[in-house]
Amino acid sequence: MAGLGPTFPLHRLVWANRHRELEAALHSRKHDIEQEDPQGRTPLELAVTLGNLESVRVLLRHNANVGKESHQGWAVLQEAVSTGDPEMVQLVLQYRDFQRATQRLAGIPELLNKLRQAPDFYVEMKWEFTSWVPLVSKMCPSDVYRVWKRGESLRVDTSLLGFEHMTWQRGRRSFIFRGQEAGALVMEVDHDRQVVHTETLAPALHEPEALLAAMRPSEEHVASRLTSPIVSTHLDTRNVAFERNKCGIWGWRSEKMESVSGYEAKVYSATNVELVTRTRTEHLSDQDKLRNKGGKTPFQSFLGMAQQHSSHTLAPVQQAASPTNPTAISAEEYFDPSFSLESRNIGRPIEMSSKVQRFKATLWLSEEHPLSLGDQVTPIIDLMAISNAHFAKLRDFITLRLPPGFPVKIEIPLFHVLNARITFSNLCGCDEPVSSVCVPNSSSAISASGSPFPCEVDPTVFEVPEGYSVLGAERSEPLRDEDDDLLQFAIQQSLLEAGTEAEQVTVWEALTNTRPGIHPPPRVTVFEEQLQLEQALQESLQLSTESRGPESPQKTPPSPAPPSFEEQLRLALELSSREQEELERRGQQEEDDLQRILQLSLTEH
């Protein structure tokens, strides 16, 4: 290793791709494998960016962290995709899934142990997807997650499984988590097919070599990533501020209070919440760029999923450069903390488009609600957020420093025309009785458990229903993150946190080796829905045109050819915007009139 310099020895070996010496240095355990160089890269990030496959292989064998994000918010896997090297992507993807599975094996029992220490309860979480666009709001579904918690056992029922091929997927499913001494048991109950899939989560049951081998992705899997844009979407809450909502008219305004599920709640607005979406395409061929740009349906374009393509201004490429070092940066320049690279960088020149949108989230907080956000609700959201993008966004939001109180209702943006509204209700069956939940006499129960709102949950709700077939019980098949069949959809929807690679899948698809969307809806269903949407647009446009004037039909010139679907969608959006502006204008005018009347009445006295 002589001549490589005293600082950043692992990085310098990676720079030169001297992988045998790198192996020896890592075996000595004298160096920090996660140390960052002056540009903020770990040895693994540097090796991937430079395309040094042999060094990447050595670092991954020594358990370098694949989940780390760069200071710019890009994951190691995303940087691997940007190289365009299929072998690099396959290797990084395999180790990423391996490290995720290992973390889940240890993490889920820990979350269940947290639940064990909290009082038992039953609660319902109503998810409503809302939009300010009328046509979209009609297509938005709602779902109620029913949650039972007893000891370290948890059951979550849902009927909304996901969103695939532009249709919402329905089905009655239960996800049951049961803590055990050596780990945890996870069951997915498909009530429609009366089938139960089981998986035992225990590190002792999975040999690392077998687990790693099972994580090897298919060639199609790798190819789909290499022919799709790299997308990072995240909520930026660094500048978020919480303000109390006001109600009343001028001169008599007060802080807003609302009753939610029987609890008085203070209403807050969270301002300066930004949704940042970035898309990279430098790894795509011209054909792939055209396909991804033109492959979006008119409805997807209407929802704002089409991004404008732009390239970053880069330093000129030099003759002595390589594809992964286009500006011929030397090792001395790169590793010198006092040397400024300015616009020069290593790796492929980045082609990136970005969109920043500002939103206002709303919170209804009740200080008298008996549930504990940290002890009872957060572990559940953590369990569901392992693989569900909606829960992941909810988790990121509730981990902020919220004002005091339990969030009985939350409204957060998912992307710029779609919000999610989550309401906690029917706590312990107090609003609507639940057969599996019993609330004892308050006096004796409170003294026994110390909980302000205790309830008893029937243990049979965590058992396999009678007559159901059990598949995969105690199987040795490892966990697998099978989110990639949904990757293209997730990119188009911008409903994922690609910075941490939390794409949208159901819990069981992320915990087991089950492929998502095994039975996708037939294409005719999607086509029929688009026809229905187009028909609705035509009717709404026709009605709006007829209402504009009393022109007789005899004087009407021959009607031109019907507008395209894209044009109809554009017109519908314009009409929706006009109607919204008109409503706001009328509301403002009414408030101004009220203020004038009040001022006049005050001056008369």
From Swiss-Prot:
Disordered, as annotated region: 538-605
SUPFAM superfamilies noted in UniProt: Ankyrin repeat
Chain intervals with Low complexity compositional bias: 538-554, 564-575
UniProt KW keywords: Cell membrane, Endosome, Membrane, Phosphoprotein, Repeat
Recorded GO CC terms: cytoplasm; late endosome; perinuclear region of cytoplasm; plasma membrane
A Pfam family recorded for this sequence: Ank_2
GO annotation, biological process: negative regulation of receptor internalization
Keyword Chloroplast (UniProt): no
Residue numbers of Phosphothreonine PTMs: T556
MF terms in GO: ubiquitin-modified protein reader activity
Repeat is among the record's keywords: yes
PROSITE patterns given in the database record: ANK_REP_REGION, ANK_REPEAT, UIM
Domain UIM: 482-501, 528-547, 564-583, 589-605
Secretion signal span: none
Positions carrying Phosphoserine: S552
Superkingdom, natural source: Eukaryota
UniProt feature, compositional bias: Basic and acidic residues: 576-589
Compartments, as annotated in UniProt: Cell membrane; Late endosome
SMART domains (alphabetical): ANK, UIM
InterPro entries: ANKRD13, ANKRD13_C, Ankyrin_rpt, Ankyrin_rpt-contain_sf, UIM_dom
Function: Ubiquitin-binding protein that specifically recognizes and binds 'Lys-63'-linked ubiquitin. Does not bind 'Lys-48'-linked ubiquitin. Positively regulates the internalization of ligand-activated EGFR by binding to the Ub moiety of ubiquitinated EGFR at the cell membrane.
PANTHER family, alphabetized: ANKYRIN REPEAT DOMAIN-CONTAINING PROTEIN 13 (PTHR12447), ANKYRIN REPEAT DOMAIN-CONTAINING PROTEIN 13D (PTHR12447:SF2)
Binding partners and assembly: Interacts with EGFR (ubiquitinated); the interaction is direct and may regulate EGFR internalization.
Annotated protein name in UniProt: Ankyrin repeat domain-containing protein 13D
Organism expressing this protein natively: Mus musculus (Mouse)
Gene: Ankrd13d
